[in-house]
A protein has these predicted regions:
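Preference for long, amphipathic alpha-helical scaffolds in soluble/luminal domains
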Residues: 4-376
Length: 376
């Protein structure tokens, strides 16, 4: 246990307040975005100078969820800031909801179908090529809104219809997963089955947080996660095993989040891997060069049983806020058959990297809380 004086505690509380007010300020400067939606940009990986505003709901859902997680432990004034951020952030999520009324969500707004907003000639295909709702945004937004268990259970039932082997089988994963009835990433019936290890972590986090009835597809999804860890594929084949996240540090963060979500009785096989995950995380930390990557790994290692890395050095807030390390990636090769997917997944011309300064700050705020409790 680290005993800190009142001066350090006050400094941490002020620091927390400053981060929250900066996050709120970023939310209020979102010209060109729906009200309350945090600004994010889409960067073409092949040409990093090609950056476009991307009005998605993904990062807003993550920020709301992250801040709400620690709300009860904040000072009353900080709670008021978080309350306003949450209220504003959730005010526009309805335009991203399934246009037929189903309780699922899309990455982009559904009232005016789009693919890659502000993409010039690509937007001629907005209606014909618009993406279906996805599991990732759906569970993130339902969780952020704290929907009832009854609503969560209905969506969970719907998910069972989109698992591998239900109607079609995956054609672009590792041989070990070919017949595994794990969840696809998409709700669309016309979409090929698409596995993403990080997305599956989010889905199971949602299932456990709501203590929903565990299904065969939940078990299969957990099996995919633990098999990948056993074989270290989340490190050596990150862009293949999690094509929409693609970075080992980001995958580690998602695994850690699953290990802290709700009822843990169904994930004992994953809990048993915490010592291995801690060792892998420390190895990645030793070679990390990006400040945001450091934040993700530092947060993950605490949940894997590591002793918090406590430092008196003030984090480089500006460097983390403007980090070019991508938390999320649009990988156009992710749905191609295996022989094509494997090489193309590594190439920059098939990817768009997403950045959100406000979410970077939320991750930093969370990390500081985990490593040095801010409000004690």
């Amino acid at each position: 246990m680290v005993v800190r004086g009142n001066t350090q505690s006050s400094t941490d509380t002020i620091w927390s307040y400053q981060i929250l007010t900066k996050i709120q300020a970023l939310q209020q400067t979102n010209t060109g975005f729906p009200p309350g939606i945090f600004p994010s940009t889409r960067v073409y990986a092949y040409n990093k100078n090609n950056s476009k505003n991307d009005p998605n709901v993904f990062f807003t859902g993550l920020i709301v969820h992250t801040l709400k997680k620690y709300h009860k432990l904040c000072t009353p004034y900080q709670q008021r800031i978080i309350n306003q951020i949450v209220k504003d952030g959730l005010s526009s999520v309805g335009v991203f909801k399934n246009k037929s009324g189903r309780d699922t969500y899309n990455f982009w707004r559904t009232d005016t179908p789009q693919i890659f907003p502000n993409a010039g000639w690509l937007n001629k295909f907005d209606k014909s090529q618009s993406l279906p709702d996805d599991f990732d945004d759906s569970v993130i937004l339902l969780w952020a809104q704290e929907v009832t268990k009854e609503r969560a259970a209905v969506v969970h039932d719907t998910m069972q219809l989109y698992a591998n082997t239900k109607v079609k089988s995956i054609k672009n994963s590792l041989p070990a997963f070919k017949n595994l009835p794990a969840y696809s990433t998409w709700f669309g019936k016309k979409m090929p089955i698409d596995f993403d290890m990080a997305v599956l972590c989010n889905v199971l986090s949602f299932v456990n947080a709501y203590d929903l009835q565990w299904t065969a597809s939940d078990s299969a999804s957990l099996q995919l996660i633990t098999t990948a860890i056993d074989n270290k594929w989340h490190v050596t084949k990150a862009d293949f095993i999690a094509p929409h996240y693609a970075k080992p540090a980001v995958i580690m963060y998602h695994i850690a989040r699953l290990l802290t979500a709700g009822n843990q009785q169904n994930i004992q096989t994953l809990i048993a891997l915490k010592p291995i995950l801690l060792k892998q995380t420390d190895s990645l930390l030793a070679n990390s060069k990006d400040p945001l990557e450091n934040v993700l790994l530092s947060s993950a290692r605490v949940h894997f049983g590591g002793i918090p890395i406590i430092t008196s050095q003030t984090p480089d807030q500006a460097a983390i806020e403007q980090s070019k390390y991508p938390f999320f990636i649009a990988n156009m090769a992710s749905m191609l058959p295996s022989p094509v997917k494997r090489p193309l997944s590594k190439l920059a011309f098939a990817k768009f990297e997403y950045r959100c300064p406000a979410y970077n700050l939320a991750l930093l705020w969370e990390n500081r809380y985990l490593c040095v409790p801010l409000h004690k």
